[in-house]
């Protein structure tokens, strides 16, 4: 495991990768207020997120429908492969994510920053 923190700049904020092995990854996702990650799913990546600070709107596919949850610090969600989801910051927020190591496994369905083939 690397001892270095890796900061990855994103159009919506940044990620701090604090652990990375061949079996898991740990990161803090900082989302600036009013910004959102893409509406996405993963083919293999399995992740659990927990809101550490701020206020977050979390959309997740449940029973075939996209459900919206206003999340408070300490609340968490398990996102299994194939589950459509998106995080939008109501306030500046920090999300702790622990996942399997497939960091490039992102299928974007909508993206306000024009990344990939996603709709804006």
Regions found by a protein language model. Give the residues of each.
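Double-stranded beta-helix
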Residues: 3-10, 88-120
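A short glycine-rich, His/Asp/Glu-containing loop-to-beta-strand
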Residues: 4-45
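Short, surface-exposed secondary-structure edge patches
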Residues: 28, 48, 67-69
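Glycine- and acidic-residue-biased ligand/ion/polar-headgroup-sensing regions
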Residues: 44-62
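Short acidic-glycine-tyrosine-enriched beta hairpin
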Residues: 62-82
């Amino acid at each position: 495991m690397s001892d270095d923190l890796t900061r990855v700049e994103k159009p919506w904020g940044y990620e701090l990768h604090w652990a990375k092995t061949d079996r898991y990854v740990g990161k803090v996702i900082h989302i600036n207020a009013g910004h959102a990650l893409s509406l996405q799913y993963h083919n293999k990546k399995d992740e659990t997120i927990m809101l550490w600070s701020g206020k977050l709107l979390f959309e997740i596919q449940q029973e075939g429908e996209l459900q919206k949850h206003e999340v408070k610090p300490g609340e968490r969600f398990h996102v299994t492969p194939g589950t459509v989801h998106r995080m939008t910051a109501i306030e500046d927020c920090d999300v702790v994510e622990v996942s399997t190591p497939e960091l490039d496994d992102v299928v974007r369905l909508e993206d306000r920053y024009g990344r990939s083939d996603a709709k804006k």
